[in-house]
């Protein structure tokens, strides 16, 4: 059944949409047609991203390897929990004269997120990096902000992390959640890597609030980098390593993107039948890849480098305790 089309204003066209995460559903309006194209183009322009195709103006982490340990010791890094949610850019802008708060996923799908008390200054153009996740205690959606690209029309992406975070929080100083809001707005807490005991205590608290699947380790001094960032790391427990494959045929053949060949190439097969062209997240168990969930928020498979690095991560099996114990002497 085709969702009904709703006209929310002069020219902004949306469709009703439902996102399901960790068993909880959130009803949103998905922006479609020219309205969607306009918002994506505005974000690309505001972020000053000269990439050929639209993409999220933020970094993609790489899985950490033992060879990266020395880099962590020689540079300043902060750590936080890796929430198991959906990555979005939160984009405040004006469309056809209307002030809108939108969230945009990796597939360039745009949703309206209608908070009630957004400070007007943000609509000069603001791009915040964050994740939609579920507060398992309150059984509500939370949008966790962890970085900023543009704040109230001012580009902050070249600043260090502390300055970007300060600018973002200051711009939201007057914001207050109300019961009608679709999600709770929160900030990610970054902790210096040289404080392993504090990090472990924080992770215990975070695990009691959110579904988490490891760590994010971010450079303090580095600016925002669009695309893959080899100085931004993620660490997942051995049982949580996953790859996003593309279904290459309905019999379950799965593939990755090979940049040298500029096409998807098969690397295995799943049991069962699937929709050709869809993206599926799979975990590795008992020597084979197993289906976990569909990824409608993505429109392309992981590339060969990600695939090969994930296989190395599975082999190295680095644990969170092993990583944090490197800094015990501190």
From Swiss-Prot:
The keyword Transmembrane helix does not apply. It catalyses: a 5'-end diphospho-ribonucleoside in mRNA + GTP + H(+) = a 5'-end (5'-triphosphoguanosine)-ribonucleoside in mRNA + diphosphate. InterPro entries: mRNA_cap_enzyme_adenylation, mRNA_cap_enzyme_C, mRNA_Capping_Enz/RNA_Phosphat, NA-bd_OB-fold. Its EC number is 2.7.7.50. Keywords: GTP-binding, mRNA capping, mRNA processing, Nucleotide-binding, Nucleotidyltransferase, Transferase. GO terms for molecular function: ATP binding; GTP binding; mRNA guanylyltransferase activity. The active site is at residue 82. It holds the Pfam family mRNA_cap_C. SUPFAM superfamilies: DNA ligase/mRNA capping enzyme, catalytic domain, Nucleic acid-binding proteins. Its cofactor is Mg(2+); Mn(2+). One of its GO terms (biological process) is 7-methylguanosine mRNA capping. Belongs to the eukaryotic GTase family. PANTHER family: DUAL SPECIFICITY PHOSPHATASE CATALYTIC DOMAIN PROTEIN (AFU_ORTHOLOGUE AFUA_1G03540), MRNA-CAPPING ENZYME. mRNA capping. Transfers a GMP cap onto the end of mRNA that terminates with a 5'-diphosphate tail. Monomer. This is mRNA-capping enzyme. It comes from Paramecium bursaria Chlorella virus 1. The lineage of its organism: Viruses, Varidnaviria, Bamfordvirae, Nucleocytoviricota, Megaviricetes.
